[in-house]
Amino acid sequence: MNEGGAPPTLLESTYSVPTDSQDSEFNALPEVVRTVLGRPYNNVASFETTQIQGGITNRLYRLEPVAFVRAEDGGDDALRSLPPGVIVRVYGDNTELLIDRQKDIENFVALSQQKFGVKLLGLFKNGRIEEYFNDSITLAPSDLCKPHLTDLIAKELCKMHLLNVVKTSEGTEKKEPILFKTLEKWISLAESIDWGGDMDKKERVEKINLGSVREEIVWLKNLLKQTASPIVFAHNDLLSGNILYREGDSNLVFVDYEYGGWNYRGFDIGNHFCEYAGFDYTKFAEVYPNKETQMQFLSAYAKEEMKLQASVDSEPGSPKFFDKLERLYVEVNRYALGSHLFWGVWGIIQAKHSKIDFDFLKYGEERIAAFYYSKKSLIKNGLA
């Protein structure tokens, strides 16, 4: 975990990892680490390379040094002075359509300066190298509902939301939420896609009916105007694959801030609840956390907020505290609707441009279907 803020000098290289085939990408990874990070990595003869399963925007690999080139360069003694490994993130093809890479890097550096998360070690043309969170595992969707992890995630997310994030290139950045600004941009991109001869995808997108999705965005915007939610520095993509957990000291960190930025608190928490489904939204109704699980998360979040702000607004367990949780529950579940539209439209765009082996259009279809299901459920229960 980052204990020393951002690196004094961020190492950068014009080196580009070839992505024309999985083998060429995999084989190029040791060289990118040697080239970008320099000594002592450039004296490492071999690395153990492992692909990490997580998100579906990029490809992630862990590289652990195995042996030095020559004993006089340090041998085993120097090898022990190296970190156990580094993470290499290779950006997905055409992801610049969806992600502002400059802001992505600024997010990473700004959070690193706050000693939040892992360090950014270096950049190359189509990716970056990050600190490896030692002895950690990547959580699975089924882990998110485990009580001890629910509490830890809630507390860490609260800490992130309370950070005073300043991006040095912009000075004091205007706290403008990204939700609807991004949705407008993405749905315009989705509408402009030429599917060519791919009639299957073309017909499936026509069935989704992006015109109706636009109408739902307007409906949601009006609903959320009536739903107070503070603007915080949000992760915006807190799926299980972006949470690393170390059981030895019960510590966890969030990674991958490329969708991060100022946004509504309710969206960030609601989006995390949606991620209990992983990438299979056919079972969304079964795995979306029930009220009891949500209230456990929200209680841990609210208690951490009171602790960090030294607030005596309401005592945990008091009627005032429970009223606060009920309001937060409504806020989060309303904003969760935005998560479905956000990632639903994203899936349509990725279905056109991404080379990652994943059915993005199916994912987009399922997220938009989950929006309609959730909207109906909220209306039925008097929450919308």
Predicted feature residues:
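A general structural signal marking secondary-structure boundaries and capping sites
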Residues: 37-40, 157, 161-168, 194, ...
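Active-site activation/catalytic loop segments of kinase-like enzymes and analogous catalytic loops
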Residues: 266-315, 337-355, 370
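Juxta-kinase regulatory segment immediately upstream of eukaryotic protein kinase catalytic domains
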Residues: 1-51
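Catalytic-loop of the protein kinase fold
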Residues: 233-235, 240
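Catalytic activation segment of kinase domains across protein kinase-like and atypical kinase folds
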Residues: 241-280
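Helical subdomain adjoining the active site within ATP-dependent kinase catalytic cores
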Residues: 201, 310-384
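ATP-binding pocket architecture of kinase catalytic cores
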Residues: 50-213, 219, 223-230, 248-250
